[in-house]
């Protein structure tokens, strides 16, 4: 038997918390009967309906690495009718993203059919490393020589783990930035605070997973064997260049 909210979350419909709200709001039926308790147990024989749509009630967690191109937003629906990540994912089941990349950022975006798996990756206690390659215009020395930890910008504290200069030329510098908790536009705001303008931002690693040889718009599924190792924290570094 499985908790109803967990099944809805694992089906990729929404997070477990939002699944509980849908249930309490009378949006969920089991075998045609409206259910109001998120703690309700179901099994593989039950037919589950969410807002009028049937879902597969039991499915294994799956995980994909996707190279998000610039110009797409990480949402299922956009009120401004901009192009979204999920409109481009032909051939995948319904998935949700683990975290986000903003419109003008690119690189590694994790996708899953499991709200529980997404929650495991996203919660701060997971302490999963996010690595970015960042190109910026401005004086790199001012950033590197100052203390960029525990910065307070517009009332929000930012605490990047490390910022390392990779290379520079007359106009731009490339940096490697490591975060363990990503806040909205964190890197861009930190760099702007120190007088640098970010003009390219690529996420190349999330936890043990690296972007490898993927090109913008490409995706690949992580094998069940590797996924189990990631979930059990036995895999600290993985790159698949198939």
From Swiss-Prot:
<dbReference type="Pfam" id="PF01479">
    <property type="entry name" value="S4"/>
</dbReference>
<dbReference type="GO" id="GO:0000455">
    <property type="term" value="P:enzyme-directed rRNA pseudouridine synthesis"/>
</dbReference>
<keyword id="KW-0413">Isomerase</keyword>
<dbReference type="InterPro" id="IPR020103">
    <property type="entry name" value="PsdUridine_synth_cat_dom_sf"/>
</dbReference>
<dbReference type="GO" id="GO:0003723">
    <property type="term" value="F:RNA binding"/>
</dbReference>
<dbReference type="GO" id="GO:0120159">
    <property type="term" value="F:rRNA pseudouridine synthase activity"/>
</dbReference>
<dbReference type="InterPro" id="IPR018496">
    <property type="entry name" value="PsdUridine_synth_RsuA/RluB_CS"/>
</dbReference>
<dbReference type="InterPro" id="IPR006145">
    <property type="entry name" value="PsdUridine_synth_RsuA/RluA"/>
</dbReference>
<keyword id="KW-0694">RNA-binding</keyword>
<feature type="active site" description="Nucleophile">
    <location>
        <position position="102"/>
    </location>
</feature>
<dbReference type="InterPro" id="IPR042092">
    <property type="entry name" value="PsdUridine_s_RsuA/RluB/E/F_cat"/>
</dbReference>
<dbReference type="InterPro" id="IPR050343">
    <property type="entry name" value="RsuA_PseudoU_synthase"/>
</dbReference>
<dbReference type="InterPro" id="IPR020094">
    <property type="entry name" value="TruA/RsuA/RluB/E/F_N"/>
</dbReference>
<dbReference type="InterPro" id="IPR000748">
    <property type="entry name" value="PsdUridine_synth_RsuA/RluB/E/F"/>
</dbReference>
<dbReference type="InterPro" id="IPR002942">
    <property type="entry name" value="S4_RNA-bd"/>
</dbReference>
<protein>
    <recommendedName>
        <fullName>Uncharacterized RNA pseudouridine synthase RT0532</fullName>
        <ecNumber>5.4.99.-</ecNumber>
    </recommendedName>
</protein>
<dbReference type="Pfam" id="PF00849">
    <property type="entry name" value="PseudoU_synth_2"/>
</dbReference>
<dbReference type="InterPro" id="IPR036986">
    <property type="entry name" value="S4_RNA-bd_sf"/>
</dbReference>
<feature type="domain" description="S4 RNA-binding">
    <location>
        <begin position="2"/>
        <end position="69"/>
    </location>
</feature>
<comment type="similarity">
    <text>Belongs to the pseudouridine synthase RsuA family.</text>
</comment>
